[in-house]
Design a protein with these regions (language model features):
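Short hydrophobic segments within beta-strands
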Residues: 23-25
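Amide-donor transfer/coupling interface in amidating biosynthetic enzymes
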Residues: 85, 118-228
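Structural motif
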Residues: 60-62
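Short acidic low-complexity segments
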Residues: 44-55
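Extreme N-terminal starter segment of soluble prokaryotic enzymes
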Residues: 18-21
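Cysteine-nucleophile active-site neighborhood
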Residues: 65-137
Length: 228
């Protein structure tokens, strides 16, 4: 009778064979994501080659940087169209999440438009509200939770990215701009106001926080993504 004990090594073996691509573009903090993947037994390729991205089983779109510069690079290398047309799962991280949105206040930048929401700059309400939002903060997510923002209701849906998680896990953030809670929100965090900590639509996943800097919690999130 199968006991489930083979699940972990079988998944690890599957990850070794997986074709994983990391989008190369004008952004920083790429190599910490590559190292996180390597710790999980994955050998990713860092590329701005459209064909390699299209052939990958999973794509990660991480980075820190400025929205207009990043979008300029994506357009010049035809990566904007490639990312919008991907069929396999892709995970945007930090600015990667923001670039998947419709528009960013950072540099008044038109973005990829995958998520139908605009990226806004944090507006401190109190003296103790510091921008950027930097450090550890908690995730809120539940399949039946409803969150009111500006009078609108949104249903938060379990996407599989947080499989096995309980509410209140801490993850690491560094950002001055945020994605408001929207129809594609799957996790929120409170800082100045509730905002989208993670998004999901079809094969597109995104986190505002850095799973690669979030210790064992972040490792589980990356592992869940690879196993989607």
């Amino acid at each position: 009778m199968y006991s489930g004990r083979l699940f972990v090594p079988l998944q690890a073996e599957k990850r070794k064979k997986m074709k994983v691509a990391v989008v190369k573009y004008n952004a920083g903090n790429i190599y910490s994501v590559i190292h996180a993947l390597q710790r999980l037994g994955v050998t990713p390729v860092l590329t701005d080659n459209p064909e390699e991205l299209q052939k990958a089983d999973k794509v990660l779109f991480p980075g820190q940087g400025e929205a207009s510069n990043a979008m300029r690079y994506l357009r010049e290398h035809n990566l904007d169209k490639v990312i919008r047309d991907l069929k396999n799962p892709i995970l945007g991280i930090c600015i990667g999440q923001q670039l998947m949105c419709r528009h960013s206040e950072e540099g008044n930048t038109d973005c990829l438009g995958i998520f139908d929401v605009d990226v806004l700059r944090f507006q401190p309400q109190r003296h103790e509200d510091k921008v950027p939002h930097m450090g550890w903060n908690q995730l809120r997510f539940a399949q039946t939770e409803e969150l009111r923002v500006k009078g609108e209701k949104f249903q938060l849906i379990d996407s599989g990215l947080f499989k096995g998680f309980t509410e209140g896990e801490f993850v690491y953030f560094v950002h001055s701009f945020y994605v408001p809670v929207c129809a594609d929100t799957i996790a929120t965090t409170d800082y100045i106001l509730p905002f989208s900590a993670a998004l999901h639509k079809d094969n597109y996943y995104a986190t505002q926080f850095h799973p690669e800097k979030s210790g064992s919690v972040g490792e589980r999130i990356i592992k869940n993504f690879l196993e989607l």
